[in-house]
Swiss-Prot record:
GO terms for MF: arginine-tRNA ligase activity; ATP binding; glycine-tRNA ligase activity
Keywords of this entry: Aminoacyl-tRNA synthetase, ATP-binding, Cytoplasm, Ligase, Nucleotide-binding, Protein biosynthesis
Taxonomic placement: Bacteria, Bacillati, Bacillota, Bacilli, Bacillales
The protein, known as: Glycine--tRNA ligase beta subunit
Swiss-Prot/TrEMBL GO biological process terms: arginyl-tRNA aminoacylation; glycyl-tRNA aminoacylation
Amino acid sequence: MSKDFLLEIGLEEMPAKYVTSSVLQLEKRVTDWLKDNQIEFKEIKTYSTPRRLTVLVEEMAEEQANRVEEAKGPAKKIALDDEGNWSKAALGFAKSQKVAPEDLTFREIKGVEYIYIKKEVIGEKTTALLPSLEKVVTSMTFPVSMHWGSNDLRYIRPIKWLIAMFGEEIIPFEITGVSTSNTSRGHRFLGKTATINQPSDYPHALLEQFVVVNASERKQAIVEQLRELETMENWQIREDDDLLEEVTNLVEYPTVLAGNFEKEYLELPEEVLITTMKEHQRYFPVFSQEGELLPHFVTVRNGNHENLDTVARGNEKVLRARLSDADFFYQEDLKITIDEAVAKLQNIVFHEKLGTLTEKMERVQKVALMLADYLNWQEEDKQDIIRLTNIYKFDLVTNIVGEFPELQGLMGEKYALLQGEKPAIATAIREHYLPSSAEGVLPQTDLGSLIAIADKLETLIGFFCVNIVPTGSADPFGLRRSAFGAMRIIQANGWDIPMLEVISRIVDMERAEGATELPSADVKKEVQTFLKNRLRVILQGHHIRHDIIDAVIGGDPNVIPQLIDRAQILNKHADAEWFRPTIEALTRVVKISKKYEDGVEVDPNLFENEYEQELFDKLEKLKYDYAGLTIVDRLKAFADLRTTIDGYFDNTLVMTDNDELKNNRLALLFELASFIKEFAQMDEINVK
């Protein structure tokens, strides 16, 4: 037999961005509780609004199933006394398991006999277990939490009511003075209390009180109303998943309405208007069918269609004040030059241990010019780098960016173009912040890519030099994001930048300018390890086998695009027939070459058989061709060496008693191993 179970946590309004994650957490905790208590059920449904987190468990068993449990006790030698009677240890074990001594048996495990018992456990009634769900509710954790009243519980918002029902029965427990009942609360202004007679009545009972408890249904209702308004007004209201998710969790009974603002505000940059509407007011901007921004907005009311005109006028008044402020800020920004803005950066501290923004920009300029040298950029390009790095943070002191920090870079581009900067420089000001997330859009220009890499690497290494590094989940300065972004850009452009050398030079530069809390060698090693770990994430994103990732990172990690190419090529051919014997042959070369003593050079005059000469000749050809070979051709060249290597080992005793011959043979293998190890640490690849 089974019944439905309903658990609702009624709260003061939660922040919209935490509603979905909170109800999913509740679902998981209840699911885990059911499994831990071995209570069978059919399905769990979740419901949520800004004022409630709810789970409805369908067809929950009325009692636990009876089960057979086994338990291991003391070893036989301890369980029996000298006369073969049960010892105190055995009797104590039987008592603890609530069985009679005659129920004890022996079982052998790895040659040792132990007491074992097998007992039937009668399942408890579900109603006897359900009150312990109180601990499930109180154990929830949130990104933000608070105390209220005199209780000790920290929660996302104060708990105002609780429902816990198994069928028609109320499951009694209390949290912070709030007792469970079968009564919920409807919409704050339109609804009244709702009595729940059965858990399955819950959605309909709340709908009668103007609460759509199903978040998906609320979202769908908003989308349908938006599409209806689009058709009616011949507008275009662009899809915005983040904004839609937020407004869905801001309301309990959604009604879409439109408002207007003065056309003169359309003279503001489009990004300012859209950000004001979306980020500050949670409004949807409106566009024409041709994609032009129109002087209208759409918002979602938490209520019905009554007095919509009044509500629209109120929203218009609020937006008008916001846009008036934005227009004032914009006009004030237009009064100052870029150079005047740049001068203010010397008064803004980037970090107390790393100086001002001006000092950071000077360091980034050095890094960017260094990278340009590696990439063989022309003098004209370097002049653009110098101008760009002299100004690229200037918009941080503008009024608009002060009000709308998310527009940094975007406004820099706008203002730079208005003041006559080269379009390439203006674009790079915007692009240097990219990517803004792990999968975010990358810079599309060479100059923007270069400055983004330089800025991110300088930030990363600067913080490492002053011993500020990510720990666990804590990364307040976004260093993981900086590293990941820099490497994604390098990969996307296919730039063969020697990362180990670049890291070393940036560390030396940072230390020369005062960032000296850690020894240089330690910082270089830590940064290399940190970047290798970010590389692992990139390679995992390409679905590369873990052993191949270990192999290529253990090889030459210097040039990122080449490393990724090597990983992809190895991964692609890992199932080929020739792959296993090739890897085994190359691994054998590398392992034996470790016995090489430095300083010995290969002398062909000491070769004693044709196999030594053949391996030497092919190695010489490989050395001559290697730099010009593609990654695929390099792997093919190694594969072609396999039969030669096998023949060499079958007919040549490397570790001979003759030291001169032994050292000569090790020197030959060492030279070959240097090419193999640069490609990958072959012994990390699993070919069994």
